[in-house]
Design a protein with these regions (language model features):
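N-terminal intrinsically disordered, low-complexity, charge/repeat-rich segments that act as generic
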Residues: 1-60
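Solvent-exposed alpha-helices and their adjacent loops that cap or buttress functional pockets
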Residues: 39-41, 111-114
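Generic short beta-strand
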Residues: 46, 119-120
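Beta-strand/loop-dominated core regions that host nucleotide or nucleotide-derived cofactor-binding catalytic loops
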Residues: 62-107, 113-115, 121-159
Length: 159
């Protein structure tokens, strides 16, 4: 892979991030650091890695699944509550350990979150706890007392 090919990959992947997460996401995820794009055997971009960890995986669906480093970058740059699910003290240690988020523990959520969206799970004090996939729409996360709200992929055990 040449440097020009890598730059083209980053530009294309940045456009996907803008489509998926909004206009500020492209520069948040892909700006300011040296990135490595791994490829599948067919040559398709697969993993986007940075010195601080995995930004995300570019799936066959044409969307990103967030890694913890990507969730941290979005959390630091997107306005609150975009792509966030906020939980309290009761579930914080479990979510940080990589356990799923249940609806009864959700205190706040971006009203535009839909099932299948990638989200950052944050503590009400602002710490990133995990990243994962929303399983319920935002309104149901707040209304339901049972059910899984977010399938956690990576917990922030290092914080």
């Amino acid at each position: 892979m040449t440097d020009a090919d890598s730059g083209m990959d980053i530009d294309a992947l940045e456009r996907v991030a803008v489509y998926q997460f909004g206009s500020a996401a492209g520069s948040a995820l892909f700006g300011g650091s040296e990135l490595d794009v791994t490829r599948s055997t067919s040559g398709r971009p697969r993993q986007v890695l940075a010195p601080d960890g995995r930004i995300g995986t570019y799936s066959t669906t044409g969307r990103f699944t967030l890694g913890l480093a990507g969730g941290r970058r979005l959390h630091e740059s997107l306005p609150h509550p975009d792509y966030r699910v906020v939980v309290g003290d009761e579930s914080e240690p479990f979510v940080r350990d990589g356990k799923n988020v249940f609806a009864k523990f959700v205190q706040e959520v971006d009203p535009d979150v839909r099932p299948g969206d990638e989200v950052a799970v944050v503590h009400h004090e602002g710490d990133l706890l995990a990243v994962g996939r929303a399983e319920l729409p935002a309104s149901d996360m707040l209304d339901f007392q049972t059910g899984m709200a977010v399938a956690v992929r990576d917990g922030a055990t290092d914080n």
